[in-house]
């Protein structure tokens, strides 16, 4: 960094450390406290590293002494802790290898053991088998060295070793062995069978349910016996009038059993209440067994308790009482969720643990007859929804299938799964099968690398910067087939994102994948990331101007341009992108000024005013359509009206969440995102379709609660006004209509619409 660059302070890490300390010291759940203690250690590392100069947060190389290609351990907000992610204790397979070879239990010894003839032969066998599991990209470095040596690329292999050997003591450079090869890249899953099995195995009994079962199976029958015993003393309805032969010995037995039940069944406490029915009858029984006569007050309490119990449930043994107890017994006999969770976990134990579940329905089938008795449940009982929801997270299928099933429920979840497909596409350019599998694993592991907090227009480390990836670059073949495959994957992912989640901004990880695929397909398309308002540097890279120009070619004079008052021809005329002396990233002063001018901001940058930064960033998103125009450039057939209606559904849902929301600004911002995407899709439809949509929006709004109608009516009115040919004034108003934006430096008009109840 230069002296002119902005640096990150310790305020945020200190705040996170304080929160973690509070949770670790006060939370009632032990597992939560343990997780908080881990966060405390990591945030303490961040604070200490920043204070001591070991960390340079905001840089691509935030950890002193570690090159950019090392995967750093990163905590919330993109802060590096100072530790490498591929470090830590030896894995079990590493420990086994050290013991087998008689080596010291340290990584340096293991590192050099792989470079012996025997070690290289093992690596070669591992490469050919494809049976390994890569968690961090560093773990493919030595397998690449083995491949290079086998391919006769000795100098390239030595070059990789020169880069990684200085870190042999801290990092692991080999993958963990696995029982299985990598599966079909087209099949994805959110979690593995092993992941959900462990979750189900940890499912504990529900305390409330268990308490209810104890009441139904233990204390209700005891209460019936107690009531029956007292009813035997009635004469003409008066309790305690007679004492039959054998009554007192049976009373002694019942009280002894009460002591036993109390010791064995501790969940219920109602029976201990001396003023409750059981408490009154039991206390009176103890008095009689002790040889004392009941006082008039005690006799009256017993009489009242017996009469109340008989009125409520009837005489024990009567048809109505028997029917009630039989119904309660059936309720108590219902399998509990934790029992069924354990049963399903046992089914999952027989499946491959490192991949998803191909046939979820079979795993979730009703209880088999041979499973019922060992599990203590009823044969034919269906799997409860809470258990099914956990298992479904491991469902394996194509992206489209998982979106349709609701397994992938957000664009963020989609973004987490796309590296598998993108990795296979990138690896397809390597003809050698072993190297292709290894490259696929490297790419997927690299995409799981957490993003760093970066300042001064720095970009995240790219996979091509890894020394071992550079070393095999010459083995890559760029053909029309590989380019076509990259384009197909690009179109597929973009289509899945925009059609699956039309009201959501593309998450930055997905934007990165689409950008990489575009380059592999030889398509020069501008993909822009969502910028963080709290670290915005006041300028945009040149690709934002390129994206705005691309949007203008499609949207000039459209509903979108008229709604947001965009002069796309003027944007097309901007041509001032250039490289700056203090950074490598190209920028456009004219585009920066345009974004600030559109919100009436001064020329002075507002690095430390989040709201002021947010309104400027939002204008860049408006001008560029935040990747929607770029997606349309791919020629994807977008069902525009259908997508616009789905956006409207999201807008209504988000508007409803504003009501009584103590922190509504994030919801308002997401609402504006959905509204903007709706406008883009509407702009792709005909004028007749737009008019019909305006009527549709008003009709949908009319069915909403008062607080939703009041908050959203200005936006719907403003939309109809622009569709009919009108314009907003300089303040974004048109009569009672308003232009809907997400960011503001004053109170947002949606937050004070009038009625609050």
Description of each model-found segment:
Residues 1-757:
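Long, compositionally biased terminal regions
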